[in-house]
Every structure is written in C-alpha cells, then in structure tokens.
A protein has these predicted regions:
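Structural/interface elements that position substrates and couple domains in central-metabolism enzymes
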Residues: 2-444
Length: 444
C-alpha cells in the first residue's frame, strides 16, 4: 500500500474546492436512503450516475420514477434525472466498469454485540476488485458506509488489491473514506448544502478526483487519513446522541421537580458553547444512525481496551425514555383493558423510517400490559405494522383519537399540533407537540 499523502497541505487541512468538475461517470452501490440521495444529487449536479441495487423490484420501481421510501424532494429529482438520462438504476455490478469512480453506500447494521457488520461493504469491495481487473483506466473507490476506524486500510483496500491484481496508489486504483452526514427528512438539502465534506485518503490522485466530484458544492473540504475520516462519522453521531440523552436525563429530573425542561433548554442553548440544537427533550432518539453508531463506537472502544462509560450511558438513558412514557400513562390510568392511541410512529417527522423508533418499544410494552393499541402516522404505518402486527392502524389522526381512551404523541408531525384534535382525551406528549386540557409531558 502506497503512502502518498498530498504534500500541498497538512493532514486535516480544510479548504473550499476551486477545481472545475470534470463530470466523472459515477457508480453508486446501494439504493437505500444514503445511496439513492447521493446518486440523485450527483446526477442533479451534472454527473452521469448508475445506482446499483441488488433488489430487482427496487430497480424496476426507480426506473419507473417510483421512490421506494419517503424523503422530501427525492421524487422530483428522480423524475427529472431519469428524463435527462443522467441517472439510471441497475442490478448489474458490471456497470462499474463503465464508470470512473464507485461510491459504496451499503448498510452496516448492528450485530448482537453492538459491533458494526461490514460484510456488505467487504462484499462490495470484492466485487469492485473483480470488475476493475480488466479495466485499463484508473478507478476511485470511496466508502460512504459507516465502518469501524481502520476498515478501509486493513480490509477494503487489500480485498480490492487481491481481486483486481492492481496496486492501490497513483496508478491502479485509489480508495478513500468519504462519510455522509445526511439527516433523514432533510437528506437532499444536507447533501447539496453540507457543513463540511470529509475525504480520508493517502492517495493524491484519489483526493483530486473526489475534489472534482464535489466541486459543484460550496462547502469546506477537510482532508484526513482514512481512519480519521471513519472516526469523524462515529464521533459526530456520538456527540449529537450524547446531547440528546443529556437533555433527556436533565428533563427527567425537571419533571420530578415540576420544572419545564423546555425553559431550561432555551436558557442553556443561548450559551454559544452549547448552542440550541439537539436540546429538545422527549421520548428518545431512534433511526438508522444514532443507536447503531454509538453502540458501534462503544464496541470499538471495548475491543481496544477502553471502557466506554459515557457511550454506554447514552444508550442506557435513551432506551429508558420510551418506558417513561408508559410509566407516566400509568400514573393517570390503568393500562390493562384500555384503548391507547399512538400518534407518530416514525422516529422523526419527514420520513417513513421506524428503525429503532421509540414507538416500537412503547407499542410492544402497551400490548404486553394488556392494552388495545391504535396507531396513526402520516408516512410510516406500513413499515410499523410489519414489525408490530397486533396494533390497529387508523386512517386519520381523528379516527385514532376517537377510538382511544388516551393518546401518546411520539412524532412531531405538524398535523398533530392542533389542541382541538384531542377534545377532552388524556394526552401524554413525548415531543412537545401540543397542549390540551388533559395533558402531561414526558419531561415537562
């Protein structure tokens, strides 16, 4: 493996790219939230993009202008870039050979011990290596998937070298860690207007080509080593998750003292050292990133002889928050035999994603305690019902309220804010969405 750190600037040097994009042909492996947003935003920037996906039904849907999940703005991008022929979906990995670079955007789910499962990343690396073996031109591989620090250099690059017969460096192929920082529900905006672009590589040519790729985007670019880039992603999510768990724990104390934590959050958020973001106390965080990445980083720490006391506490606090909603409900009424409505199933508004959502744990606990559970969400009911089939889905918030003895509000969709929706029903609010006659908040 060649060590070709760019001598033009120090490690960690941040700059704004002034290079003119050469409009490379790009292949993206994976058409999930990250891969599809990445592919379509690059196509919108003028690149020719092929998005490679193993699920044939998803490929057919995409090429028929159908987005397989909810993400604001994605449908418009898909339709316009299919028309312009800058974007196409395929299940043929050999499409990589006709492109200049490949972005790996496959999932790295949690294993039972909390570690990140990188088998899909390594499978992609092996296939890339075999496909570029006979390709005469230079090829860049950028891993956007979240992986443990050291994965690119210890596993991905050796696999590509072995399968391709090429040497990593300035001649055969170049590799980089290029983590994403997209928020579901705001992913298109976040890709086109990022706070920073992180490129972790030791190869000058790979950095230059990735700089060209991001030239249309006006954002600071930081060049670091691959392990540092991999750690930046995990550490960023750990910091944000820590802020959420800390305000939730403070909120739990405030609740018992009769203090509204929202007033406390406003006051501490005005401190520029703290800032107002991620200070909304509630029933806990969910999604595909925070829980997985904090657990993954904790396991990296353990495997390297560091006891992750704070990382473990972030998860412990978060896993307790949904159950506080149930405990709060029990202060007001007997759950066994009651009809309980849940408004909001997605882990946040603007998405249909229910992965690690507080609603999952709450619904299962209510069912275990003998409640009949009615649910509504503006986007996430199908995905939720697949995981918790015993709930009863409602076609509107009004139906859910009408059929229920009490309501738990778990996602801050604007459609749940009107107090008149609830009448005289008891409302347990986990997100600070509304304020009704019979009302209690999880942290206020």
């Amino acid at each position: 493996m060649e060590d070709n750190i760019d001598k033009d600037g120090p490690k960690g040097h941040a700059s704004r790219s002034t290079r003119k994009s050469s409009r490379a042909r790009v292949s993206v492996i994976g058409a999930g939230y990250v891969g599809l947003v990445t592919g379509l935003c690059l196509a919108e920037s003028g690149f020719e993009v092929v998005c490679i996906e193993s699920i044939r039904e998803r490929v057919s849907a995409l090429n028929s202008s159908t987005v397989p999940f909810h993400e604001d703005g994605l449908g418009t991008l898909l339709r316009s870039n299919l028309r312009s022929k800058r974007f196409i979906a395929s299940n043929d990995m050999r499409s990589i050979k006709r492109t200049d670079m490949t972005l790996v955007c496959v999932g790295t789910p949690s294993r039972p011990d909390g570690s990140l499962d990188t088998k899909e990343v390594l499978s992609a690396a092996s296939q890339i290596g075999r496909i570029i073996r006979d390709k005469p031109d230079y090829h860049v591989v950028a891993v956007k998937s979240t992986v443990p620090p050291g994965t690119l250099e210890s596993k991905v690059i050796p696999l590509i070298e072995r399968e391709s017969g090429k040497k990593h460096g300035e001649d055969g192929f170049g590799a980089a860690s290029n983590p994403e920082f997209l928020r579901e529900g705001n992913a298109v905006h976040d890709f086109l207007h990022p706070d920073r672009i992180v490129i972790g590589t030791r190869v000058r040519k790979a950095f230059a080509e990735l700089s060209d790729l991001y030239a249309p985007i006006d954002a600071p670019m930081i060049k670091v080593t691959p392990p540092a880039a991999e750690m930046i992603k995990l550490a960023s999510n750990a910091f944000l998750a820590a802020k959420v768990s800390l305000i939730n724990e403070i909120g739990n104390v405030c609740k018992e003292l009769g203090i509204d934590v929202r007033e406390v959050a406003e006051g501490i958020g005005m401190d520029r050292r703290i800032g107002p973001d991620f200070l909304r106390a509630g029933c806990g965080f969910g999604g595909s990133c925070f829980p997985k990445d904090v657990k993954g980083l904790a396991e990296v720490a353990r495997r390297n002889g560091v006891e992750p006391l704070m990382l473990d506490s972030i998860i412990e606090v978060n896993e307790g928050q949904p159950l506080r909603m149930v405990e709060l409900l029990e202060r007001h009424m007997k759950i066994n035999g009651a009809k309980i409505g849940i408004l909001g199933l997605a882990f946040k508004p603007g998405t249909d994603d229910v992965r690690e959502a507080p609603s999952l744990r709450i619904a299962k606990e209510l069912l275990r305690k003998g409640a009949k559970v009615y649910v509504h969400d503006f986007q996430a009911m199908d995905g939720f019902r697949r995981q918790v089939p015993k709930v009863i889905t409602c076609g509107s918030p009004e139906d859910c309220v009408r059929l229920s003895d009490a309501i738990l509000v778990l996602t801050e969709w604007p459609g749940y804010a009107d107090p008149s929706l609830y009448g005289d029903k008891l409302v347990i609010d986990g997100r600070g969405v509304t304020r009704t006659k019979e009302y209690d908040g999880v942290c206020w």
